[in-house]
Amino acid sequence: MFQKEHLVKLANMKMPFGKYSGRVLIDLPEEYLLWFRKQGFPEGELGTLLALALEFQIEGLESVIRPLKQV
């Protein structure tokens, strides 16, 4: 289960490595997140957040997260 802090991090934390380095997690392409699910999410908080981002995208709930972005 996720915590509300996870939602804020999804909206603001940037991908630290890879093809989409620097992109906010909730804005990562679904195909990229599906690839991670197939290969295995990274361990720790980043993996948890990537899995959560995928679930929000699959359910079409990205619009719930985007208002939490801090300018």
Report each predicted region and the residues it spans.
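DEDD superfamily 3′-5′ metal-dependent exonuclease/proofreading module
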Residues: M1-V71
